[in-house]
Every structure is written in structure tokens, then in C-alpha cells.
Amino acid sequence: MKVAVLGAAGGIGQALALLLKNQLPSGSELSLYDIAPVTPGVAVDLSHIPTAVKIKGFSGEDATPALEGADVVLISAGVARKPGMDRSDLFNVNAGIVKNLVQQIAKTCPKACVGIITNPVNTTVAIAAEVLKKAGVYDKNKLFGVTTLDIIRSNTFVAELKGKLPTEVEVPVIGGHSGVTILPLLSQIPGVSFTEQEAADLTKRIQNAGTEVVEAKAGGGSATLSMGQAAARFGLSLVRALQGETGVVECAYVEGDGQYARFFSQPLLLGKNGVEERKSIGTLSAFEQRSLEGMLDTLKKDITLGEEFVTK
């Protein structure tokens, strides 16, 4: 199994690469790519960790050597948020970066599963889909927006609030991956209940958690370490499913049946070909139903922005 990380010299990329070097199954290959010249050195640094995962690093304009034979590609390349910016302010720079990298994926490893971490995810996933479609290689079961950070944050905050072990809480999060489009289904956590006010406050905290980190880092970056952990969790789940493990479920932002929007984050059963089944979002509380209806315009606008970036 070969995993490629694009944007591997950045804060998320390095954290992700470290976790994958330690946790990928024995015999896996890990290839790191970034435009930054330090990237081969990051790979050498990680190569000294004693795990049976082969690692190589590549830098420069051309990601092709890193992509050859990749089964899974995780894209974290792009610029990070600064205080006062929201995820959509990143669009102007990151849209072009994602488009360029996905064009190279379409040529070099068109059958790979691709996980997009680069923000704004609501939009960059739509860009990736249109690029792959243009190249004639789009498979909607193999393109994912990685929203796992919303899930792990939800798990942490719920556990704190309710005095649970964080490892015992699993919160499904649906919708998208910014602001109001992030909707944790707090009503679906077994053995935990919330007043409507608690649910509203907690939902807001989960939606704004990224901004909390950006502000706390005081201009020094955005969420890199928790995002690296989230991306590793998603990437490792995907690898396990691709290798034939059954019952692997993760939430991610994918093209579905279009019931709510063309792309929508929901629980997915993963399998040997990527998405095996898009699972139902289940029964929502009145608050969740209102939140879902209230986000759809924003989500659809984000998606259209990405589609038009490629098609216009």
C-alpha cells in the first residue's frame, strides 16, 4: 500500500507524515512531496524512525515521482489561516494549488483514493472533482474531503462537558467543513443528552474551534497538529478498508445522491474501492434539522465557487 502526502513540508504535512510513518501497516510505502526544498530532508529525518514503512521525499514543481503507484493521496498543500481570515479567504491561493496537484494525480495515479485537507474544503473538493471529471477519471467513491477534525473535536468537547472518556465518544458530523456548515449530531450520541441551549453552545464551539486555534497561535499558524492527527486517522481507516478490513466507518465530505447538496459530509462505510456505502444521517433533533436547513445555501454557494473555478 502506497500513501502519498502532498504538502508534506508544512505544519499539517509533517505531523501527518510522522503519524503515518509510525502507524501504517508494515511493508507500506510513504512518499512525501512539497514544493519546498526541505522535503527530501523531512523524509530522511523520518526514515530514522524504526518502523517497516519505506519513505521517500520529493520537492520542486513536479509531484509526479511521488505519485507513481500511489493507492492513497492526501493533499494538505496550501496557505494557512491567519487571525481575521476565514477559510474562504484562503480560496484565492489554495484553489490554484489544488487544481494543479489534482491534474497531476489524474495523469499519474488516476485510480488512487484522494483525501483533500486543503481549505476551504467545501470548495476545494468541488475543484478536485471537476478536474478529475475533465480528465475523464472521476470516481465519486474515491474523492473525499477530510472532515475528521470536526469529529475528533466534537468527541473531545463532548467528553469534557459530560465527564466521559474521549475514546468512548464518537460524534457523527454532517454537512461541510466550515462555519455553519459543520453540524455535529449531538442527539445521536448513546447515553448522553443535551438541553437545546447546551446543544446550541456546543455546536457553535465546534464550528468555531479552528478560529480558537488561529487566535491562540497569535498569527503563528492554524490547527496543524490536531489536523495531522485527524488526517492520519482518516488515511489509516482508508488503508485498512482498501486492504479488505470490513466495517470501517468514517464521516467525510463526498459526492452523494444530492439530497442536500452535491457534496455532503456523512457517515461512510469504506471498502476496497473507496466508498462502499453512503450511510443515512439518521433522525435529527429539531435543532439539528433547523441547522441543516439553514446551512444549505452556504454549502451550495461554496460548491458552485469550486465548480466554476474549473469550468469557467
From Swiss-Prot:
Its EC number is 1.1.1.37. Keywords: NAD, Oxidoreductase, Tricarboxylic acid cycle. The gene is mdh. The active site is at H177 (proton acceptor). Catalyzes the reversible oxidation of malate to oxaloacetate. Gene3D superfamilies: Lactate dehydrogenase/glycoside hydrolase, family 4, C-terminal, NAD(P)-binding Rossmann-like Domain. PANTHER family: MALATE AND LACTATE DEHYDROGENASE, MALATE DEHYDROGENASE, MITOCHONDRIAL. This is Malate dehydrogenase. The keyword NAD applies. Coiled coil: none annotated.
